[in-house]
């Protein structure tokens, strides 16, 4: 498996996010202005794009935001999500980052907690789906 980095939203990342967040989960406002300045990452199995995420600077010095982590259905349950978190943490450390924050769907918070992410703040909604902020010090 190979991770490719883009400073723009590539078609492969767009396709994965469309499948996962729009087609499967029903989000209507999946793509936003953050896509214009975030670094985008796509994980490939051979030439097949199978997962994506984005990273951008947070509000505080040394803080980075991880978002739009998506794995296509056929590859779920194979620890790819956990591998992505590890890769994202390495990327942030290479940028001299000190922490990662993310806005997790509440149904996925245990997945992030297993990797050391801790909840903070209030539960909010994005398009009617509960989300919680989570953070990990690196």
Identify the residue ranges that each predicted region occupies.
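Helix-loop element at the rim of GNAT/NAT acetyltransferase active sites that forms part
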Residues: 15-28
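Conserved active-site tyrosine of GNAT-family acetyltransferases
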Residues: 17, 112, 117
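Conserved beta-strand in the GNAT
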Residues: 42, 48-57, 63-70
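Conserved acetyl-CoA-binding loop-helix of GNAT-fold acetyltransferases
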Residues: 71, 77-90
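Conserved GNAT acetyl-CoA-binding A-motif
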Residues: 85, 91-105
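Conserved catalytic-core motifs of GNAT/GCN5-like acyltransferases
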Residues: 103, 118-133
């Amino acid at each position: 498996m190979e991770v490719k980095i883009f400073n723009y939203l590539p078609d492969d990342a767009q396709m994965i996010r469309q499948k996962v967040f729009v087609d499967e989960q029903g989000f209507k406002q999946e793509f936003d202005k953050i896509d214009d300045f975030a670094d985008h990452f796509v994980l490939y199995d051979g030439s097949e794009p199978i997962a994506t995420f984005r990273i951008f600077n947070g509000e505080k010095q040394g803080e980075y935001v991880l978002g739009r982590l998506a794995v296509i259905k056929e590859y779920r349950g194979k620890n790819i999500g956990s591998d992505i978190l590890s890769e994202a943490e390495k990327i942030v450390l290479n940028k001299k980052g000190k922490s990662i924050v993310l806005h997790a769907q509440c149904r996925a918070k245990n997945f992030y907690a297993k990797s050391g992410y801790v909840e903070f703040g209030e539960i909010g909604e994005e398009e009617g789906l509960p989300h919680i902020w989570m953070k990990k010090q690196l």
